[in-house]
Amino acid sequence: MMKDFIKLKDKNNIVTIEKGELISFKVDGSEYIHQKGSKGWRKSDDEMFPIIGPVSKNNFRVHTKKGDAIQDQHGLLREMDYVLISSDEKTAKFSKKYVKNTKLINSKYPEKSTEEKLFWPFDFTFEKHFYLENNTLKINFIITAEAGMPFMLGYHPAFLLSSSGTDTLVANGKKITLKEIYEVGHNAFPVLNTDKIILENSDRNHLEISTTNFNNFMLWTEVDNMLCIEPISQYTSYTDEKFSEENMRISSGKEEFSITIKVL
């Protein structure tokens, strides 16, 4: 049976993982991850797969060459539990394995959705690997599936802010304020065609968040103590595009993505 909590340690850095969810990243005693139970969001990280965004505008249907799949906001991966593959002092590896057309209970039903069960017409294995070293946490995502499977991928970590409302971000050479992010609301603020964002904390060291293969971010918050900085393979909120494989990435069989969170 998997331990609920795993701690990774390196010098003055401690990462805490709960059943595959990143719930703490402390460097020299300072916390950088939003704490569950605080105002804002009930989680501290999540993965969006194989869909990003609200599928309700598409009647919860995603068109694929194997027929229409039923998905809810941000996909069905979040309805599955991680299994621990291995861990040691500085690394931990988790996976989720899905068998095509398996119906999963939708936790959004009935309060926020009309769909009681979700399914996807492709097999896949989704791995999440954590590596801690020198003030830096790297997380790799490895998706193994049949070649030709359409997908989107997003990672949804929540970072702790100062509660002052004065924390800022820098991306593509431009400064972004929390006020700008609030104004976009639930659609999330797009930061496209970049693989790096700096979070300028007003009360702690800054964070550099860099990625591979995502090439986009979206930013979301409704509170001043937390900010979701989400690497995404594509941004779906402002389009009227149908959720269809024509508008998604297509798997080569094995796809790898990563995020690196570095304390500056």
Specify the residue positions occupied by each region the protein language model found:
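Surface-exposed acidic/polar loop and edge beta-strand patches at domain peripheries
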Residues: 1-136, 149, 160-264
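Asparagine-centered strand-capping/turn motif at beta-strand->loop junctions
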Residues: 141-147
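Short, hydrophobic/aromatic alpha-helical segments in well-folded domains
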Residues: 125-126, 140, 154
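Surface-exposed beta-strand/loop patches in extracellular or lumenal glycoproteins
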Residues: 153-159
